[in-house]
Swiss-Prot record:
Required cofactor(s): Fe(2+)
Protein name: tRNA N6-adenosine threonylcarbamoyltransferase
Function: Required for the formation of a threonylcarbamoyl group on adenosine at position 37 (t(6)A37) in tRNAs that read codons beginning with adenine. Is involved in the transfer of the threonylcarbamoyl moiety of threonylcarbamoyl-AMP (TC-AMP) to the N6 group of A37, together with TsaE and TsaB. TsaD likely plays a direct catalytic role in this reaction.
Record's subcellular location: Cytoplasm
Amino acid sequence: MLLLAIESSCDETAAAVVRDGRIILSNIVASQISVHAGYGGVVPEIASRKHLETISTVIEEALQAAGVSLTDVDGIAVTQGPGLAGALLVGISTAKAMAYALGVPIAGVNHIESHILAIFLERSIEFPFVALAVSGGHTHLYLVEAVGRYKTLGQTLDDAAGEAFDKVAKLLGLPYPGGALIDRLAAEGDPEAIRFPRPLMRDESFNFSFSGLKTSVLNYLQKNPAAADGRALNDLCASFQAAVCDVLVSKTAAAVSATGIKRVVVAGGVACNNGLRREMSRLAELKGIELHIPSPLLCSDNAAMIAVPGDYYLSNNILSGFDIDALPVWPLDSIASRLTKGS
């Protein structure tokens, strides 16, 4: 099956052409970072307008790069949620119009599900597995039993890990988005220079909390204003990143121990972080865990990942009707009830 996949949940306008949910023929991403940088974060209304301006061009580029035409497309997969309502609607409206015009089926898929399943674009792995989905808007641990079958093990009680990175970067005067900059600065710093707290690390649940860690960084900066410059900045970034990674790795290890499943997927934008990738690899080696982390391009928002669950649902006649609407909030473990066979 040849799928056109569309992603517009936040500030990337993306389209991809993927065969059989595994073979990427093209994967085009138009970023809005430069547009939102001056505001220090994503402005939803501006994001929606930029999606409207860009989406047709991005789709055309994806088709050209794949060497196919619209009439070759067998179905369309589109991000239905979670995400920004206006941004989602741009992608969904475009997908519905194209599917109707072409007479092909459409599948609305979950953005977080797509992050978790993106690994299948690079290799096949067996179910079940434990998944850590970690991004700017989500930090969750899931038990993944099969495509469409997910159980939430734990989640953030406040800030997501990626959100904490961006907020701390802002405290340090770093430009948006700051997570990648903290990662680069941390590489030259001492992760043991400052002992920041590890929230909920000894808690028996699999939940996360990062707002207190962010506040600890703020308090440290107020007492040590020089820490935002030079070598001290590298040490602060390394120490903050180490605290976040320690919590993520510890909770993942606990989930592996509790479920008895020694197969782990780490997915989402924060999975690009070099410190997290390194510490997860150490955990895997120490505990004999089969670890899977997609390449950075497939960790960040893209449309190729949307095609993975999209292909599964369309191939199994689990379709979305033309009344498909945006789901800004869409818990992953409720996904089965959102999909109707043969509709």
